From Swiss-Prot:
It holds the Pfam family GATase. This is Anthranilate synthase component 2. It comes from the Bacteria. Heterotetramer consisting of two non-identical subunits: a beta subunit (TrpG) and a large alpha subunit (TrpE). Part of a heterotetrameric complex that catalyzes the two-step biosynthesis of anthranilate, an intermediate in the biosynthesis of L-tryptophan. In the first step, the glutamine-binding beta subunit (TrpG) of anthranilate synthase (AS) provides the glutamine amidotransferase activity which generates ammonia as a substrate that, along with chorismate, is used in the second step, catalyzed by the large alpha subunit of AS (TrpE) to produce anthranilate. In the absence of TrpG, TrpE can synthesize anthranilate directly from chorismate and high concentrations of ammonia. Keywords: Amino-acid biosynthesis, Aromatic amino acid biosynthesis, Glutamine amidotransferase, Lyase, Tryptophan biosynthesis. It comes from Leptospira biflexa. Residues 2-201 form the Glutamine amidotransferase type-1 domain. GO terms for molecular function: anthranilate synthase activity. L-glutamine binds at G59, P60, G61, Q93, S139, L140. GO terms for cellular component: cytosol. The gene is trpG. InterPro entries: Anth_synth/Amidotransfase, Class_I_gatase-like, GATASE, TrpG/PapA_dom.
Length: 201
């Protein structure tokens, strides 16, 4: 299996690389795990590399700004049929903007905040416990009323600050999912299970 982590210049990318590497080793099959920054290679190069899975990392800034999101937007627009794509934090916000939704400033910025979520139990959430606590580092959120019909909400904050805020999105016809929180953080319960679901799907 050949997996790409597209790095949006985020400090969590190393955590992501480590955990995904462990998951790939569990499979006991040959694999290649690459990390490429969002301005390091042109989209056509990434497309021709024929990755089996692509993860779009967290990062600073707004996903509508190419200076922050780079080639990530092209990947979401062009590669969602094959291969499957998972967007994390900025990656999920990019999902919302690329497909026509809005990403706006949250009422309360979250920097290292644990929150419980409710989820639909499908896709990357398959087999995960309801009410798990997840780690949040974000000041932007997807605006629900703006989301296109192509996207469905898969998870929300279930209690506390930011209750009801969107924590997961899935494209209805493309193999694209996103989570607003950080499954690669040690503070997120069952985060490795979520990433394993994506890799093994």
């Amino acid at each position: 299996m050949k997996v790409l982590i597209l790095d949006n210049y985020d400090s969590f990318t190393f955590n992501l690389y480590q955990i995904v590497g462990e998951i790939l080793e569990e499979r006991e099959k040959p694999f290649q795990l690459d990390v490429i920054r969002n301005d390091e290679k042109p989209f056509e190069w990434i497309k021709s590399a024929n990755y089996d899975k692509i993860i779009i990392s967290p990062g600073p800034g707004h996903p509508a700004d190419p200076a922050y999101f780079g080639v990530s937007a092209d990947i979401l627009k062009e590669l969602g049929k094959t291969p499957p794509v998972l967007g994390i934090c900025l990656g999920m916000q990019g999902m919302a903007t690329v497909f026509g939704g809005e990403v706006v400033r949250a009422n309360i910025a979250m920097h290292g905040k644990l929150s419980p979520i409710e989820h639909d139990g499908k896709g990357v959430f398959s087999g995960l416990t309801q009410g798990i606590e997840i780690m949040r580092y974000h000041s932007l959120v997807a605006k629900e009323i703006s989301l296109p019909n192509d996207l469905e909400i898969t998870a929300r904050v279930s209690a506390g600050e930011g209750k009801g805020e969107i924590m997961g999105l899935r494209h209805k016809s493309l193999k694209i999912e996103g989570v607003q929180f950080h499954p690669e953080s040690f503070g997120s319960e069952e985060g490795k299970c979520l990433l394993r679901n994506f890799i093994n799907s």
